[in-house]
Amino acid sequence: MINEIICPECKGKEIVRRGYIETRLSGKKQRYYCKSCSKKFIPQNPFFRMRNTPEKITCALDLFFRGLSTRGVQEHFKAFFPHNSDHSTILRWARKFSLKIASFTDNLKLNTGNYIELDEMEYHRRKSHKQKRGVDKNWFIDSIDIKTRFMVSSAYVKHRSMNSIKQVLSRIKEKSSNIQTITTDGLTAYQNIVKKTFGYNIKIRKYLVEHKVVNASRGEGFNIWVERMHNTIRHRTKTFRGFHGSLGSAYALMKGIEIYYNFIKKHESLKGKTPSELAVPKLKLGVNKWLDLIMLS
């Protein structure tokens, strides 16, 4: 009996080995038989029924989020792989696996510092991929932990509303319990939302989080860490062609950029480490970090 394998049909645990199955991409794999429902099955992984190898798919993700266009990745594959992939397929991989990894990374508890900077970026997204219907002004709201350089929470939203900002702040509160100070720009919506999200302690008569406002128009300087992160993000997104006219596509791609920034990209200020190595020290990733994150999600 093999107890660690569970039947996908009836969730039964009375499983025995029943031969093998061999495919061109996956090679030889063990097949199992459930004694409860008489179903034969192969344990599925996130790449089930994908027509390309996990190594090729994760290579496409890495090249795309490092700066290559989908057609640039396609040309790269044409030179090194016998079976090429269409540029639209590469974009679908980026969307699909970004959201899949995000379902895992968004629920991680972080060991952050006590200081967070929060800001937003304006983006112009095409209203339609094919029709000429103009552009729509959207917002990318994000936050960074100063100590670990980890992008704690982010959201690509249609409007810079109070609910959208509260959504980002609520995720910060869920992920880390160390926050003592949050710095924002002079947007008036931040003042009430920060106080309401983190609450007030009646005993000490004090808000649980200090809210600092840095207004550049008054000569008070900038939130340099979050602005530096924005420069890195802009370097990648400046070549995007209107996010293909889809709010969902924009959200998925920006999630992929967040994952790349936190878990893949090494930072010189962190002495060659990724932010996740400091913020999530228990998470051990191998050389192919994309593959490890997909398998964990």
Model features per residue range: what roles?
Residues 1-6, 27-30:
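Short metal-coordination and nucleic-acid-contact micro-motifs, chiefly zinc-binding Cys/His arrays
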Residues 50-52, 96, 154-177:
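Active-site beta-loop-alpha junctions of metal-dependent nucleic acid enzymes
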Residues 30-114, 122-130, 148:
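Short, positively charged, Gly/Tyr-enriched micro-motifs
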Residues 240-243, 247-297:
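C-terminal domain-tail junction helix/linker
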Residues 11-26:
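Short recognition patches in nucleic-acid-associated and regulatory proteins
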Residues 186-244:
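Helix-centered, glycine/charged polyanion-binding patches within enzymatic domains
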Residues 64, 130-161, 169-171:
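Short conserved beta-strand segments at catalytic cores or DNA/RNA-binding microdomains
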Residues 7-10, 34:
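Short cysteine-rich clusters marking metal-coordination/redox-active sites
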